[in-house]
Amino acid sequence: MKLLPKILALSLAMVVTTSVAANQLANEKTAISVNYKNNRYPLLQKPYIELPIGSIRPTGWMQEQLVRMKNGMTGNLDQVYEKVMGPRNGWLGGDGDVWERGPYWIDGLLPLAYILNDQALIDKVKPWVEWTLASQKPNGYFGPDTDRSYEPGLQRDNSRDWWPKMVMMKVMQQYYSATGDTRVIDFFTRYFKYQLAELPQNPLGKWTFWGEQRGGDNLMVVYWLYNITGDKFLLDLGELIHKQTFNWTDIFLNQDHLSRQLSLHCVNLAQGFKEPVVYYQQNQDPKQICAVKKAVKDILFAAPLYSRGNSPRLT
């Protein structure tokens, strides 16, 4: 009988310890959910959550490689390729290139700047971000809006094309990840309301086929914003964007494009690969996943510009 008080005391201690541990774990999970958002219902939960840009600092070999990029073309493309990336660029308000090349550069330069916490690179990125924010019209449109006559070496037409904006959307998403600048949330909310109203009469393929084939890039940012704001109209926009995007699921499951040479633009294919998986978060139809798995089995991904079927030759 003398053992009973000891057993009871030990049991009580175990309960208290377990309860404290459970509370600590719950608090940790709450902290994680506050700082690192997973998908909001009804989107499918993701197994991994991307950390904010700059939360991990490079050292050693990785730091050396990033510094080489900073000192090389990535950090100096505005000087090496000034005709396109210099002050005449349409994404800086100039009368030069208005299409994808400027946004493409900043898509790489911005994360490099904030990962290295390099003020010189940040100062180089900021004019592009600030011009983009300031360019937004009352109806939500942003970016260059004026087509100009041909000039050798510049892309001065299709200024209203959906595709270059998808690249700049990724830039702005990364900028928010690195800085938490809340202007970006309002910026995207207004733009996506514009898209929801405009896409029915001016679909993704209106100006060029690039936006239609790469609509998954647009869709990713729509879901990203939905996870922050919970605005239901974003789910409607997600369905609309998927409907207007090239049907990669059907291509992968039912057609022979991946076995034929020169059937697909390889960059479109590389970016299209993700669209069924991105949409699966909302649609949750297993065929979206099956399509991508089948595509991975069907293709030897080697191409200069256009797909080579299952041939390893690049020429």
Task: Show the residue positions of the predicted features.
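Bacterial N-terminal signal peptides
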Residues: 9-17
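Bacterial N-terminal signal peptides that target proteins for export
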Residues: 1-8
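Glycan-recognition and catalytic cores of secretory/periplasmic carbohydrate-active enzymes
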Residues: 23-315
